[in-house]
UniProtKB/Swiss-Prot annotation:
Residues 122-136 have a biased composition (Low complexity). PROSITE patterns: SPX (PS51382), ZF_RING_1 (PS00518), ZF_RING_2 (PS50089). Signal peptide: none annotated. It comes from the Eukaryota. Gene3D superfamilies: Zinc/RING finger domain, C3HC4 (zinc finger) (3.30.40.10). It comes from Schizosaccharomyces pombe (strain 972 / ATCC 24843) (Fission yeast). It is found in: Cytoplasm. Pfam families: SPX, zf-C3HC4. Keywords: Cytoplasm, Metal-binding, Zinc, Zinc-finger. This is Uncharacterized RING finger protein C6B12.07c.
Amino acid sequence: MKFGHDFKRALENDMPPGWGEAAIQYKALKKCIKRFVFELSSLGLSAETISKLMAPTTVDPQQAITLSYSLGKEGHIVVPKIIINVNFDKLKTDKFAASMFKQLNASNMITTVRSNYASNVPSTPSDSTQQPPTNTLPSVSASSQSVETCETVDEDIDTQTMSSDMSEVQSMEISLNCDHEFFEKLTSELQSVEGLQREQRKILFNAIDILSHEISLIASPNSKKKYKSLYCWRKIFEIYMDSDIFISCKEADQSHERTPELAERHLKWFDDQVRLAKCLPSSSKHRDRILYAKFLELNESLLKVASFQQMNKLAVTKIMKKFDKRTSLTAQPLFFQVIESDPLLLVDNASKAICFSLSSKLFSIIPQLRDFECAICSNVAYKPVRLGCSHVFCLHCLIILQKQKVDFCPLCRAKEVMKADSRNIDHALMNFMKTYFPREIKEKFEENENDTFTPSSISVVSGQNNCVIM
């Protein structure tokens, strides 16, 4: 009861208007379970009885009546099926099972599916060519009114037992309205949840496109304000990636995807760190501050989508647990197994898809320094030298390696260092760094001037393709 109240209150207070109508209707599903339990009880199938009937035959091989429960699919709708298997030979000595069979047989909710015959006499070579009897029991159909019920249990068994050496196992399907209603309603509501999420994904993807375009204009190195906005947004995105708000990149976090509660705390930490970094202009009307407010709003919207999905997934788990508790039909694992292959139901990809879009569109606008660092000095790899193994190092560090006669690449151990000359300088990458990392390059030059390891003039290699650094 407590979860139902919390679920309803969270939908009303924490979610946008209209989202509650698209969510799982937990209270209505509980009422449906109550009606289903009443239908089962009218057939003598209490939760305790069902638990006994569903016990494996290895527990009680002499069981006269067994029950099996399965779930199938018709389109996106989950369809339940209850099958009662009756062994008439064992039914003679089981008064409880015989009484239950009489109650089921008198009901108009069951249909005979099939009748199988098992011989109690060991087969002989001459018997192998004989065919089993072809006559079967009359079908008990919900639409048929001509079925005669017997006066006593003994008459039922005697008239339907074929012979003393043959035992018949009859399978009957129980069709209950509330059982079908429950799963039809549940899967229909799951589609409503997915429909709302699909709509929200489109809205968020569109917002990402618009925001990325606006940031690319204001943070462009060619803008009138030069590099102020560029470094402002580089710092914002650096803090954002370190925050791991929705998806953790750390191997220690096995789940990787954050819970909405944890994501909310990380989002607040991110906002606090941006304010502490003082990378935003003080004026609230400044374009960078306006775009940052939009960026925060985008993340808060993504957080609501993730919360909505988790709440509904928890509601489904809770309602299926209650279904099993009231009926003992163990439908929960069957249900999740059936909908596992359905791309529309309970898919955990909303946050991942939107975070990927953030990374591929927003973060690609402003290159991060960590992607252009030299692996040796951990500074910008200006005047980048690309070795034959494709690894890139700054010219300053490569000169030191060659001076020390180190031929192995520090990353892959390939013998490429001593082969490097002026042809290995990546001029396109160098121009790119000049455009996006002017401050870092200036600091790099100042550090190199103070480095005692750097002589006034060093030749990278001797010969025709030498590269002289002054």
